């Protein structure tokens, strides 16, 4: 990073230092009150939709009660990482640094992120789903977010299951990934899902024209973190 800034370093040492790490979803500690979370590190707070696009806009974590509870009674608050650092880096013509520090990411992969609060405003869960709106080249690697999170929490101690293909699901070339993993550590139950496959009806070659079809595949990841001992739904995800 020092080489990227060159002569600008003497004028902006704080910028170089701050670009080393942005507060992200996985920095948030379960059991923390909403009022004590680093709200300044995030923007665009809204009610979550179980990992989908944001719904009603809200002012911050402490507005969790404005979001309807899920079946578990928890309130999902979606948000994005603050993008001020990205724009500051761009202003200094550091496109590489801006790319690294830009967007909302989990372990360097673009993601939709949210936090789950109980009625008392205590953080009880974290959720991340790979962002399918990104360009095709980046989306190809989205499934790797699950492995990156597993590495972050330690490569050992994971229980993983490779699920069989569902109806109409096929490999991409020779690759078929449909894996769920779980680990309990430091009072947390961490659940990851990785998918790399073609769904029913998706193809690489248009059978009528013989032309290449782009984007017809699933490459995705999902992360759910709850307190150890959390109940699971029918799909094995923590509730």
Model region roles, listed by residue range:
Residues 1-10:
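Bacterial N-terminal signal peptides
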Residues 17-65, 90-112, 119-239:
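Non-cytosolic coordination micro-motifs
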Residues 10-18:
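Sec/Tat signal peptide C-region and signal peptidase I cleavage site
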Residues 63-90:
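A low-complexity, Ser/Thr/Gly/Pro-enriched, surface-exposed linker/loop concept
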């Amino acid at each position: 990073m020092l080489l990227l800034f060159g002569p600008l370093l003497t004028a902006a040492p704080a910028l170089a230092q701050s670009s080393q790490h942005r507060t992200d979803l996985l920095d948030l500690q379960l059991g923390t009150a909403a009022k004590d979370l680093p709200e300044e590190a995030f923007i665009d707070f809204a009610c979550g939709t179980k990992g989908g696009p944001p719904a009603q806009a809200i002012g911050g974590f402490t507005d969790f009660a404005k979001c309807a509870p899920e079946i578990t009674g928890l309130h999902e608050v979606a948000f994005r990482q603050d993008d001020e650092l990205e724009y500051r880096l761009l202003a200094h013509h550091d496109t590489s640094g801006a790319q690294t520090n830009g967007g909302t990411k989990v372990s360097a992969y673009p993601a939709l992120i949210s936090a789950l609060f109980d009625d008392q405003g205590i953080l009880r869960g974290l959720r991340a789903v790979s962002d399918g709106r990104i360009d095709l080249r980046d989306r190809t690697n989205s499934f790797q977010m699950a492995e990156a999170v597993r590495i972050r929490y330690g490569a050992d101690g994971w229980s993983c299951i490779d699920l069989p293909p569902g109806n109409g699901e096929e490999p991409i070339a020779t690759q078929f990934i449909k894996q769920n993993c779980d680990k309990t550590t430091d009072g947390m139950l961490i659940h990851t899902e990785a998918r790399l496959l073609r769904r029913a009806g998706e193809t690489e070659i248009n059978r009528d024209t013989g032309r290449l079809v782009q984007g017809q595949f699933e490459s995705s990841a999902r992360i759910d973190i709850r307190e150890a001992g959390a109940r699971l739904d029918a799909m094995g995800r923590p509730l």
